[in-house]
Amino acid sequence: MVVSVQEIGQRAKTAATDVAGLTITTRNDLLRQMSQALLDNQSAIMAANKEDIAAYANTLSQPMIKRLTLDQPTIKAIATSLLAVVALPDPLAGPFDTWQTHVDLKIVKRVVPLGVVAMIYEARPNVTIDAAALTLKSGNAVILRGGKEAIHSNTVLANILRDVLRDNALNPDIIQLITDTSHESVNVLLNMRDYVDVLIPRGSAKFIDFVVANATVPVIETGAGNTHIFVDQSADQKQAIAIIHNAKTQKPAVCNAAEKLLVHVAIAAEFIPKITEKLVRAHVELRGDQASHQLDPRISLASEQDWDTEYNDLIMGIKIVSGTNDAIDWINNHTTHHSETIISKSSENVAQFMNQVDAAVVYQNASSRFTDGFEFGFGAEIGISTQKLHARGPMGLPALTTIKYEVFGQGQIRE
């Protein structure tokens, strides 16, 4: 029986009370069992995943197909990531701030779950597991709504996790998947203020903008990464080439991959042919401004739209800038506030870049590919927030909690 999105919300609200009451011992034990259940059901997972890939093999890019694929090494890595979440501290544990007021009221500032967390995401079935693990560990119920491209994979994964809850005589609706992949299901979810405490979208900039513009439930913006690398005049060019190559080509379809390259004019004539050669060999299509195109004809002319596009593919934009001020101004006009990088030996320029670039994560001399919950030591991540309220940057367990004030008295009344 297909359950309506509204009914899923109602069930999640009930389940939120159930999961909030679980001890950390129980939550961790469930995660261990879920990890093993994924390993025990690899054949079913891969069979479902093959259905998804077969359905979209001709419409998705190769990087997107790679994100969609669940093979044995990937499933093992996902199962291992659950054990990494087990090893993390309980986000709901104390010590809590406690104080006495002037009328001898005792106030305790507790950390508590958000309640019902809804996730909307595109063709990344690993997010199903990451989101379920982090919400369970932090005492939340979760509603998952993945993209149609991964519906078979997500359904099998969610059922495996729900079966573990059932096997432990717990409410399986602590973890729910919306199997209706229509736009209408998204529209309903965006407006379930009575049931959803926070909505976290993961996907393209266009998709996230749609969610923010149309949701009445609280939203944490995540993910879109029109990420820049600025190569300063003082940069170690060999180091810069290695960083750019890694940030662009290692996993081009993820939000922390580099999309744009800014090069200081003083080194452009020397550096641009070098980086062009390296990237062209890696099958990266280059689109640049007139100045970079003149330095190397392998760089085609970029359109105005290119500068604001997150490619999620082996494509990169290149622009020559006059210096640090110019780079900062350009980035702040085109950034999605995710991750931005400067490659420089100048402490003055680095300090200015770090201070003035408006992004959740700012790097010196390192690949933006490290913007990741696991790499930051948070375990898995629920997403990478590009906004400033509640959470910013890679969101681990603390981002899935809020506070509650408990006040203890002995009959006090306010005069």
From Swiss-Prot:
Catalyzes the NADPH-dependent reduction of L-glutamate 5-phosphate into L-glutamate 5-semialdehyde and phosphate. The product spontaneously undergoes cyclization to form 1-pyrroline-5-carboxylate. Its EC number is 1.2.1.41. GO terms for cellular component: cytoplasm. GO terms for biological process: L-proline biosynthetic process. It is found in: Cytoplasm. The keyword Transferase does not apply. CDD domains: ALDH_F18-19_ProA-GPR. Pathway: Amino-acid biosynthesis; L-proline biosynthesis; L-glutamate 5-semialdehyde from L-glutamate: step 2/2. GO terms for molecular function: glutamate-5-semialdehyde dehydrogenase activity; NADP binding. Pfam families: Aldedh. It catalyses: L-glutamate 5-semialdehyde + phosphate + NADP(+) = L-glutamyl 5-phosphate + NADPH + H(+). It comes from the Bacteria. The keyword Amino-acid biosynthesis applies. It is an enzyme of class 1 (oxidoreductase). This is Gamma-glutamyl phosphate reductase. Its main location: cytoplasm. It comes from Leuconostoc citreum (strain KM20). Belongs to the gamma-glutamyl phosphate reductase family. Keywords: Amino-acid biosynthesis, Cytoplasm, NADP, Oxidoreductase, Proline biosynthesis.
